[in-house]
Design a protein with these regions (language model features):
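General small-molecule cofactor/ligand-binding pocket signal
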Residues: 37, 72, 125
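Short active-site oxyanion
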Residues: 3, 33-36, 68-70, 104-108
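A generic structural signal for short hydrophobic patches within well-formed alpha-helices
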Residues: 13-14, 43, 79, 116-117
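A general structural signal for well-ordered alpha-helical segments in protein cores
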Residues: 23, 43, 59-62, 75, ...
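Short, well-structured N-terminal submotif of metal-dependent ribonuclease cores
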Residues: 1-38, 50-61, 130-132
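Active-site neighborhoods of divalent-metal-dependent phosphate/nucleic-acid chemistry enzymes
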Residues: 71-112
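Acidic, PIN/NYN-like endoribonuclease modules and their adjacent C-terminal/linker elements
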Residues: 1-3, 99, 103-132
């Protein structure tokens, strides 16, 4: 049986990268590279966060890793689906693009972002209020 496709949201990448308690739980859920879909908007968000938090060299290494996964560019079909999901679920633009990418590709979304709570096709690993 083939492992399911998963889109890993920026919030989950960050928890995994910093090695938090939540990140350790997530590491068991992280897909192999061939099942890991990476929207280009996630690469943008990750790059911004990484350069700010750890510097360009480590940012380049993580982005290089994401490029070994299945990178999914924003195309018209995903953009229009994102617009629908934005309106329907009141998501921020980047969140709508990430969620639309997962829905368009028939993948599960792995996230720590409570904005996705209750949406179909989402595996939410919510941050404990003590983690904040």
């Amino acid at each position: 049986m083939t492992a399911p496709l998963r889109v890993v949201d920026t919030s989950a990448w960050i928890e995994w990268l910093i090695g938090s308690a939540l990140g350790k739980k997530l590491s068991e859920q992280f897909p192999d590279k061939l099942q890991c879909l990476v929207p280009t908007i996630v690469q943008l968000e990750l790059s911004k966060w990484l350069v700010r938090e750890v510097g360009e060299e480590q940012a380049d290494q993580v982005i290089a890793y994401t490029q070994k996964c299945v990178v999914v560019p924003l195309d018209t079909a995903i953009a229009l689906l994102a617009a629908d999901l934005y309106r329907e679920h009141k998501l921020a633009t980047a969140d709508a693009i990430v969620y639309a990418t997962a829905r368009h590709r028939g993948a599960e979304l792995l996230t720590c972002d409570a904005h996705f709570d209750g949406l179909p096709g989402v595996a939410l690993y919510a941050k404990d209020h003590r983690d904040l």
